[in-house]
Regions:
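Feature captures the catalytic ectodomains and active-site-proximal regions of enzymes
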Residues: 1-267
Length: 267
């Protein structure tokens, strides 16, 4: 949806690649920054990996993961890392543009799309504004046109730097509930579950019984992963009707679908 806007500023090449599973930030983004699969991160850098059942934030070690990849390839690139959650953060980034251009690599995480997805789930007003895929894309485009990020890209277009734009995962409008049973330590994501003794009778799921075969960490010896496919989402038998009414037609990620897994890459 942004390619035309960006194409007015730069000569662009568009490509596509496939996200890892789960299509969730904790796994997919950490894999991009480290250049490793989740199981490899947990094994090689246990201090940088946080399991699902831990209370600690799951994406607080992104800058160190970038550093591990640079060092692993025995490079000596200077780099910076920035996470933009609001216009104040974007303004700060723009103000320091001259200084940042001295680095070999600048990594910028822009959280707007993810925040819009979560806000649409939690806010009735936002759900009305972005009530389908077309409206969702329209809001994204409107945000970009009036954002500091557009100003930042315009400023960068006047330099000779190379820009790479991508994401860690997409999202899908979840409309079909699937019952699943798990213990109280099972994670809360609606598109994938990991835990012990997971039970789901639906054919619309993909099960990984041995996580190590998929290069995924296993907090327990009996841990398995269950992924929703298509437009399904998981709901527990307890409070089933509440889950269905609250989450039906919300945009979710973590599972298996083309919308979640096919990732754009713009350079």
């Amino acid at each position: 949806v942004l390619s035309e806007e960006i194409g007015d500023m730069f000569d662009i090449d568009e490509d596509m690649y496939v996200s890892i599973l789960p299509t969730a930030t904790q796994y997919a983004r950490n894999a991009i920054f480290s250049g490793l699969m989740p199981q490899q991160i947990a094994k090689m850098f246990p201090e940088l990996w946080v399991d699902e059942d831990e209370d600690e934030g799951k994406n607080l070690n992104e800058a160190p993961l970038v550093r591990t990849q640079i060092e692993r390839f025995r490079r000596h690139d200077t780099f910076s890392y920035h996470k933009v959650n609001d216009s104040v953060g974007a303004d700060r980034l723009l103000d320091h543009l001259g200084e940042l251009q001295k680095n070999d690599l600048n990594v910028v995480v822009v959280n707007f799309i993810d925040m819009l997805s979560h806000a649409r789930t939690e806010s009735k007003m936002v759900r009305e504004l972005a009530n389908n895929e077309s409206a969702y894309r329209s809001i994204t485009l409107s945000w970009f046109r009036h954002s500091v990020m557009a100003d930042l890209l315009k400023a960068l277009s006047q330099t000779d730097c190379k820009i790479v734009i991508t994401t860690d995962h997409g999202s899908i409008r979840a409309s079909k509930p699937v019952k699943i049973v798990g213990d109280r330590n099972t994670n809360t994501n609606l598109r994938y579950k990991l835990g012990k003794n997971l039970n789901c009778q639906s054919k619309d799921v993909f099960v990984i019984k041995n996580p190590h075969e998929a290069q995924l960490p296993a907090p327990n010896i009996s841990t398995s992963y269950v992924f929703a496919t298509g437009s399904t989402f998981f709901a527990y038998p307890n409070n089933y009707n509440y889950y269905v009414s609250f989450y039906k037609d919300t945009f979710q990620h973590g599972g298996i679908s083309m919308e979640e897994m096919l990732i754009p890459l713009i350079t």
